[in-house]
Amino acid sequence: MTLRPWSVRRLAGPAVRPGRFVRRAAVLLVTAVVLAGCERGSSSGGPGESATGPSGCPADYDTARAAVARAERTDAPWRGPITGPRAVPGRSLVYVAQTMTNPGVAGVAQGVKEAARVVGWNVRVIDGGGTPAGIQAAMGQAVALKPAGIVIGGFDPNSTSQQVSRAGVEHIPLVGWHAVAAPGPSRRPPLFSNVTTHVQDVARISAQWIIAHSRGRAGAVVFTDASIPFARTKSELIRKELATCRGVRVLAYENIPIPDASSRTPREVASLLSRFGDRWTHSVAINDLYFADAAPAFRAAGAPGAGPPYNIGAGDGDPSAFQRVNSGQYQSATVPEPLTQQGWQIVDEFNRAFAGDPASGYAAPVHVSTADNTDGATSWDPTGYREAYRKIWGR
């Protein structure tokens, strides 16, 4: 295979020499070949025509550019709940985490704790460790504690169907975060509410960012975790949206479970760099952490931190993702979940359940964060929700 040392052409300064890059790329190629027999979970398009060729999608580009401009605004007012029951006192919650190494799961847990302090509730976090057995054990422990409510933190409730059934017998309401694809109540699995943005909106704006940023000419790689239904749905929608632009080609669809991301992502990225060279212009991942794990491979190849490839995370916008975006280190944008706000919403949904009220069903609008609109912040924390929820709860 002939390598295309695009990073040499785009890195300025005399210190970067083609010979040095080629030697680094050759090492990456050998490493990727050696590791090719190890665990892989990708499907890719063939070489095809270059995504930087003359074909584009003018109409789709204009639509994408306008949508991204709206999503980058930071001054939108709070449009979530403003009415509801006053705080029910003396309750306890158990937050069952898919894995606390998932920054989104961990960020929401902190939001739940913050809001629970306001209403005077107790919160216990149980880490499922990212494995089916661990999550089942964590759910079993949560039900055995007989709390007032249990949070399904970032995993498929169907994978713990026995424990979910036991919670139903004990009349323990369940509120999910990214537990199913749609926000609001769910009958199967039985959730009082599921807190999330609309996955269709997140997928669409992530793909539109690539279309707008590339002017409709890109070679993209999609990173996902197909073991999580929410993540799988998101990545499939991203791939579908990218396909609407004829000038964008999905080069590879990489299935890397989040618990394995730290070990697998670097070698998968090394392999992708050797396979696609300068055809790989953009990436999108269902979680920002993939780009933290990809950074060593990009550095080893001599890829510039500011891109290409230009990387966007389609969730969850944890502090490390913002740091990469703000410093131009292997991530250009993120579509962050308002993690703290969603933690507050989870507490509000439980309060509605305890009071006998219906769920609010609120879903936060999508937002795109780049170095140009974060003002150095390390999270997306929209304004107005704390005041609104405190007023609802009488706190």
Q: What is the predicted role of each segment?
A:
Residues E39, S50-R91, P338-R395:
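Hinge/cleft segment of the Venus flytrap/periplasmic-binding protein
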Residues G48-G111, A115, R124-A137, Q141, ...:
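Extracytoplasmic "Venus flytrap"
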Residues R117-G129, L191, G219-V222, L242-S262, ...:
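Short beta-strand elements in bilobed, periplasmic/extracellular small-molecule ligand-binding domains
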Residues I152-V169, I238, P257-R324:
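Hydrophobic alpha-helical
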